[in-house]
UniProtKB/Swiss-Prot annotation:
Family: Belongs to the glycosyl hydrolase 1 family.
Pfam families from the UniProt entry: Glyco_hydro_1
GO MF, one annotated term: 6-phospho-beta-galactosidase activity
Domain of life: Bacteria
Protein's UniProt name: 6-phospho-beta-galactosidase
Gene Ontology BP term (one): lactose catabolic process via tagatose-6-phosphate
InterPro entries noted in UniProt: 6P-beta-galactosidase, Glyco_hydro_1, Glyco_hydro_1_AS, Glyco_hydro_1_N_CS, Glycoside_hydrolase_SF
Enzyme class: hydrolase
Organism: Streptococcus pyogenes serotype M2 (strain MGAS10270)
PANTHER family found in the cross-reference section: GLYCOSYL HYDROLASE (PTHR10353), LP05116P (PTHR10353:SF36)
GO cellular component: cytosol
Classification of source organism: Bacteria, Bacillati, Bacillota, Bacilli, Lactobacillales
Amino acid sequence: MTKTLPKDFIFGGATAAYQAEGATHTDGKGPVAWDKYLEDNYWYTAEPASDFYNRYPVDLKLSEEFGVNGIRISIAWSRIFPTGKGEVNPKGVEYYHNLFAECHKRHVEPFVTLHHFDTPEALHSDGDFLNRENIEHFVNYAEFCFKEFSEVNYWTTFNEIGPIGDGQYLVGKFPPGIQYDLAKVFQSHHNMMVSHARAVKLFKDGGYSGEIGVVHALPTKYPFDANNPDDVRAAELEDIIHNKFILDATYLGKYSDKTMEGVNHILEVNGGELDLCEEDFAALDAAKDLNDFLGINYYMSDWMQAFDGETEIIHNGKGEKGSSKYQIKGVGRRKAPVDVPKTDWDWILFPQGLYDQIMRVKADYPNYKKIYITENGLGYKDEFVDNTVYDDGRIDYVKKHLEVISDAISDGVNVKGYFMWSLMDVFSWSNGYEKRYGLFYVDFETQERYPKKSAYWYKKVAETQVIE
């Protein structure tokens, strides 16, 4: 049976400042930790990325032409405050005013994120969000933006608090490149959630117009053998690390007993302790019912198996299928079911996982108000022929995820939109330029844009709300 989506559903495309803009030192922009980290550790940099800093009018014109009526944009904190605090950079402020004006001119609603992996270097090198002073700096930056950019109707505090802690302190593929420090992972999650809560409360108390929420990456975690209690436990612990700890902070304003039992077990095995203060919980509690929406970023699921051994994680950054490894002491290891498709980067493609995650939010956090799927898409080594890409695999992937969103809406969940990652090809944090996600192909040499087959398909779905 053909499935449909509501008439007012947003069909969006997603971007991020550092992955799209380029111009990393232009017009007074301050450095971010990624600048040097990429130079030192990877075979690519964020220059020129998709040159969105100069070419946003082209991308927004294409958006309008192809039925994309929403865009996720992030503000580069170091374009506004080059050192994260103190002096404002007027050219950065002007750039974002111009960008938002162009969005509205093209009838593409901007959903604006304050922090998308790019803490200014001056603050990042001083502990990033492990340093509680950074909470104050973030809240001050947020307040400046709320006041300055009154044309924005949808604000997001953070993009993917989970993968930041994971990338910086567990896998070590994000600066500062620390591995296997679970206490830092949870502390980073916690301090960022306090920052989120403080900013949301400030937004509501300040009477600013518009809506505010947060974007969480929520990869669904399943036991490899659902009949084995040890595998079930491994999936629960892995879910606490990546999802439940952060969701509890967002919607409960505290960590449930079950969550803390899991956290304490993980830290007992791996070492370290957390600094959780009473005023933190007061801040979390004050904001728990104020979130206007939850953004869910979903690409894949994981299956967990009980495991007794030392932690070892190998990140597959080059798309060499089967080269990744993930096992955490006292938690478990990822083991892929044979019958579920995987990408070259070992991502397990399972649309049902998105449905299950959406239903989990509704069941466990009934004070959620609405959901946007703020990222979902398929990374490919695209083959550019005839000035396009015949990306049927991407179409199939997005179609199946839109279908489960339709199912979730039918089953009573308030899902209001979908943002495909990514609007145009951008650079990927830990995979460079080979892994493409866009609706529009970018020739990174010339910066020309070419609509892919998926763009024409997406346009039809956006115009008809019929998924076929």
